[in-house]
Amino acid sequence: MRRFLRLIAFLLGIHVAGLLMLSLFRLVQFGALHSMMAKDGVAPVSTAFVKGVWFDNVIACYVMVVPLAVLLIAACFGCYAKWLRKAAAIWLSVFFILFMGIAAANIPYFAYFFKNLDSSIFGWFGYVGTTTGMLVGEASYWPYIILFFVAALLFALGVRKWYKITDRHISSPQSSLLQKDSGKVGKNPTSLKATAFAFLAKLCVSAALIGLCIFGIRGRMGYNPIKISQAYYCDDPFLNQLGISPTYNLLTSVLDDLRKENAELHLMPYDKAVDYARQSLGITSQIDSTAVLHRHVAADSAAIRPNVVIILMESMSASLMQTFGQSQPLTPTLDSLYRHSLAFTHFYSAGIHTNHGLTATLYSFPALMMRNLMKGTVTPRRSGLPTVLKQEGYHNLFFMTHESQYDNMNAFFRTNGYDEIYSQESYPSSEVANSFGVPDKYLFDYALPVINRAASAGGPFMATLLTISNHPPYIVPQWMKTRTKEPETQIVEYADWCIRQFLAEARQQPWYDNTLFVILADHGKLVGEMDSELPQSYNHIPLIIFGPGIQPALYDGLGTQVDVMPTLLGLMHIGYDYDGFGVDLLRERRQQVFYTSDTQIVARDSASCFIHNPMLGRDFCYDVLPDGRLRQTHDDRRFQPLRQYGFAMVQTAEFMQRHSK
């Protein structure tokens, strides 16, 4: 058994030494680049180093699991072959030295790009001579190159020394399963029992260690495995990125690029698409090579700065409201608000997933079919409503029901304008209802005192609340008295009731009278019949705005989630620089809108709806009837303007997404 334990010590020693060397490179990066830290930051630096070890350990466990399993299982059967340990030492040394090389290269890369190494570096491999000349010719890179070679040499020598030290205690002639570690065969029953017990003990320890290593690869016990978002713990982008393993960052970015949903769209040439999009949005300013839609939106009068509360309701299709033809009284609160607020009749979600709704509503960027624009090894940077309001002195809060890692929300929102993030990790575990976290009522109950605290600080705030209950699995509280019998409709009643309760409690707060409320859905869901290739209920959603100075009115023009930001800032008379796809609906009436699903692109005007499926290469054309229903037509020629509009807008978004990295 001693030999077995020393074998474990041999592997563990290399593992720990590798983590220490990677931490050394992180320390060097901090020392060299600490001036990049936020000037007024108060976050503890030590947390970044702890998270860095955490991510380094994930990568280390990936390379450790094979030699660990092979050596321990062989040892269970009495095999302590020297060549196996040599192979393991070489295997681990090569990989840890590779990781050190990536960590060393990451320091000057981060200094230049303010991001960790990602798959974009492979674009340099096509210019070997130029890249080599840059690395050798730039004197500021030499210290890191020298550091790498010194560290690699020391690590290799250290592993060699450690191998020799442990080898003296492990090496002995190969023995069989029924031999003791001393090499003598026990012939009496007691000796056989002891040998069998030792075998079982080794097997159990091996299974436990291999299991721990696999758990180390997963990185955490939560619903999701570890993701980049886990490194984000404060408002300082330098410290958040310091806690990410450069190797982990590089590998996951490569995997991201290989995902089918991230394949480049080719609907029309980029130059034609951009020209059309700029013309459609009325942009006349000089074009930037990458920020092709950039323009300044001037304020039309003195700015007002009310508080802002945005509620994005999960899957709340307009078809669930009696206002839009629902036969059952599922949403009395929303229907009442619709009649007494600034409400929008023909309003559509950008996509059919939550991440699409968030990106479009808050940052005015449209959905790109199935692609998740909040995720990525390199967290995307976007300007939008949170960043503009933060510049105006707002304190921004985001409340979600589920884990903050979901859809990379923690990293994305901290990077793009939010000061505080509240998620499942913030709530008592006893309140978690399912894999999507806490129910809507608890979300609102938790958020209200936090909002009160933000309001008491004296400055304006923006609070964004993302609900979840109207998403399977539906969990309707037993105490909830509903009018309907099916869980799928009962949960809509519950979601609507939660809005009523929150607004009733908010109405008692001193900040209520100076707050703009925006209520909409993140996307819709299938309700009723399949009325087209992409049923309208998936994207047709309510938009309700009320607050100080907002006169109740019904807006019957077209609009989508990308219009929320410019419309809301227009109501507040705030000027801003803008890269988005939206318009202020109260000052400019849209002639057309576009949106997508995972496999379809939709463009529509008041009379027609065009749907294109790129995978099938097919178009579907519909006339919009007076009652809002669709009737398919095969007169494709009439739909060419809509086709061009939809293709141009989506292709422009594709261009901007690819050039924002």
Features from the language model and the residues they span:
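Transmembrane and membrane-interface helices of multi-pass
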Residues: R2-K260
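Alpha-helix initiation and N-capping motif
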Residues: M21, D118, F125-G129, I244-Y248, ...
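Residues that form generic nucleotide/phosphate-binding pockets
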Residues: G52, D56, A104, M134, ...
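Glycine-centered secondary-structure boundary/capping sites
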Residues: G78, K82, F114, Y141-W142, ...
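The feature marks either
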Residues: Y127, S176, D236, G243-Y248, ...
